[in-house]
Each structure stands twice: as structure tokens, then as C-alpha cells.
């Protein structure tokens, strides 16, 4: 890759992570992504180990799809979803009211500085968020701090090592009406997936933050990786 292309990718990655982009474009992304990875949300909700009447944290909740899936799967728990985009928080709360879910709430928050006391939560989840964090280690150590001992963490992210075949299939399902498929593929390959985590890198990042019994799997239904670990 030449220097010009590398500069463009770095520039687009910075734009990708800006709060204003998610304030403006979040609703479009929400509509486009839901059906593509809905099964992933449900799988995580079922896989998450949640004690009775526990508090669960969703970091980077977006419109709240995963938070509501966890709330439905664990009806005696209370899920708190945070996002650094206030418009995403408002969209999530609106969606929660539409779905009439009482054991879930949303608030603005920053993964770099979680505004919760130590050992507040008994489980935590995050999907598609960590690649946007300015310091993934700091964010993961913040999650570790607010979890009780013995708590479960599940985090999923786009797979940096996804094959061209898997990514092409993803493009076919994740349509953006105003973006040609070839440009969409390039953007996903170099800006979204290419600036994300491999399975090994994500597992190592979670372990480096102090989590134990780290297990990492690729997802058969979409080119994501999942890490499950314990505090």
C-alpha cells in the first residue's frame, strides 16, 4: 500500500471514531446493521453468565439492540447501556420504550472513564465498540474495575483477519444504498475491519487488562470475533 493510500485510511479512521459522525450518521447505521448481526446479539445474550438480580453493563450500546437482547434473556437483571453519542442514547431509549422493556436503561458515558463505583456490575458486554476507543487498554481496565470478582465479560468486534469471501458476503447483507459495493468493500476492509482486532489481538488485550480464562471464537454468521472472559 502506498503512502497516499495509508494517509487516506488513517484520515478516514479518525473520522470513523468522531462523536459527531455518530450523532449524525448513527441512525442510518442502526437501521443497516441490525438485521445483519441480530443473531450475534442473541447469541451473546444467551452465552452471557448473569447472576440473579444482577446489574449488567453494555459499553458502546448504540441503539440498544444488544442491551435489550440481554434484558430479554435475563428478565430479573437490570441492563445499563452507555454510549458517548447523546443521539444514540436517545435513539436507544426511544427503542426501549417501543419494545416496552422495563429492566434496561441508557445513559451517556465514555469507556475511558466509566462513571460507576468499583465492583458495580456482575456482567458486561460490548459489540463493535472497542475499535473506536482511543485507548483500548484503558477502556478494558475500566470495565474490569467496575465488575465484581467472578463477573463475566463478553466482547465482540469486527475481525481484522476476515477473508475476502466472508467480507464480500457481509457487504451483500450490509447494504448502504448510496455506496457502490466495491467502495463499500474497500472501506470495510481498510477502515472498519482493517483497523480492528484479530481474534488473538482481542484475546490478548482482554487478558492484559486483568481478565482470566479468556476464550476467543470467530462467529459463523458474520465476520466478527467474540471473547468471553472472567474477572
Regions found by a protein language model. Name each.
Residues 137-149:
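A short glycine-rich, Lys/Arg-flanked "PGG" loop and its adjoining helix->strand segment in the class I
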Residues 112-123:
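A short acidic, Gly/Pro-enriched loop at the edge of an enzyme's catalytic core
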Residues 55-57, 63-113:
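Class I SAM-dependent methyltransferase SAM/SAH-binding core
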Residues 1-50, 65-69:
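Conserved class I S-adenosyl-L-methionine
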Residues 9, 156-209, 213-219, 223-225:
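C-terminal alpha-helical "lid/dimerization" subdomain adjacent to the S-adenosyl-L-methionine
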Residues 123-135:
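A short SAM/SAH-binding and catalytic strip from SAM-dependent methyltransferases
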Residues 226-231:
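C-terminal lobe and adjacent flexible extensions of AdoMet/dcAdoMet transferase-like proteins
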Residues 55, 151-152:
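Short glycine-centered segments of the SAM/dcSAM-binding site in methyltransferase folds
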Amino acid at each position: 500500500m502506498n503512502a497516499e493510500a495509508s494517509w487516506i485510511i488513517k484520515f478516514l479512521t479518525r473520522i470513523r471514531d468522531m462523536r459527531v459522525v455518530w450523532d449524525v450518521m448513527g441512525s442510518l447505521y442502526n437501521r443497516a446493521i441490525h438485521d445483519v448481526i441480530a443473531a450475534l446479539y442473541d447469541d451473546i445474550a444467551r452465552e452471557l453468565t448473569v447472576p440473579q438480580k444482577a446489574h449488567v453493563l453494555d459499553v458502546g450500546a448504540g441503539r440498544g439492540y444488544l442491551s435489550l437482547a440481554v434484558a430479554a434473556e435475563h428478565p430479573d437483571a437490570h441492563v445499563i447501556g452507555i454510549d458517548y453519542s447523546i443521539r444514540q442514547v436517545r435513539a436507544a431509549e426511544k427503542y426501549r420504550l417501543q419494545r416496552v422493556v422495563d429492566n434496561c436503561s441508557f445513559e451517556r458515558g465514555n469507556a475511558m472513564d466509566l462513571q460507576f463505583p468499583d465492583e458495580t456490575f456482575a456482567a458486561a458486554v460490548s459489540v463493535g465498540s472497542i475499535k473506536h476507543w482511543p485507548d483500548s487498554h484503558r477502556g478494558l481496565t475500566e470495565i474490569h474495575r467496575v465488575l465484581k470478582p467472578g463477573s463475566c465479560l463478553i466482547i465482540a468486534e469486527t475481525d481484522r483477519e476476515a477473508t475476502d469471501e466472508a467480507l464480500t458476503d457481509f457487504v451483500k447483507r450490509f447494504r448502504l444504498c448510496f455506496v457502490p459495493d466495491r467502495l463499500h468493500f474497500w472501506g470495510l476492509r481498510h477502515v472498519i475491519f482493517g483497523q480492528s482486532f484479530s481474534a488473538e489481538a482481542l484475546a490478548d488485550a482482554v487478558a492484559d487488562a486483568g481478565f482470566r480464562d479468556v476464550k476467543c471464537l470467530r462467529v459463523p454468521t458474520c465476520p466478527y470475533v467474540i471473547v468471553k472472559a472472567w474477572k
